[in-house]
C-alpha cells in the first residue's frame, strides 16, 4: 500500500509541475501576443510606451532579471552625449534619458557559438531605453533588427521580444 501511496504522490507532483509549466507557457505566449508591432527605423526595432522613464526602466530591469539574466553593463548614453557635447560641437540635446542595458544568456550564446564560433560577436545582447527631448511623455525601447541571415539568432531575438513584452505589460 505504501508503494501505491508513493506513486500517487509522484503523479500529484508531476501533475502540479505540468500545470505550472502550462501556465508559464501560456503567460509567455500571452505576453508575446501583447507586444505591439515595432516601428522599424534603420537597423532598429522601436517600441514606444507612455510613462515615466524611471518606472519603465525599473520594469525593464525586472523583466531581464525574471528571465534569469544578469545585466553586465549599463551604457549611460545621454550622460555621455551631454558630457561630450562641447567637444563634439553638438548643439541639440536629443535625449532626456538614454541607456543601453547589456546582458547575455549562456545557453543561447552556447548554441550560437556551437554552430559558428564567430557568432560570439552577437553577445552581449542589448536593449536601449530612452526618452526624446521632443517627446517626454513616451519612453522608447529599442533593439537591433533581427539578424535574418543568422537562423540561430531567432532565439535571441525572441528572448529580446519577450523581455520587451514583459516590460510593457507591467
Predicted regions and their residues:
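C-terminal partner/receptor-binding element of secreted or periplasmic proteins
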Residues: 140-170
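Beta-strand/loop substructures that line and gate deep hydrophobic ligand-binding cavities in soluble
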Residues: 123-150
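Solvent-exposed, acidic/flexible segments
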Residues: 49-57, 74, 91-94, 149-153, ...
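Compact, glycine-rich, soluble single-domain proteins
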Residues: 67, 72-122
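Bacterial N-terminal signal peptides that target proteins for export
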Residues: 3-18
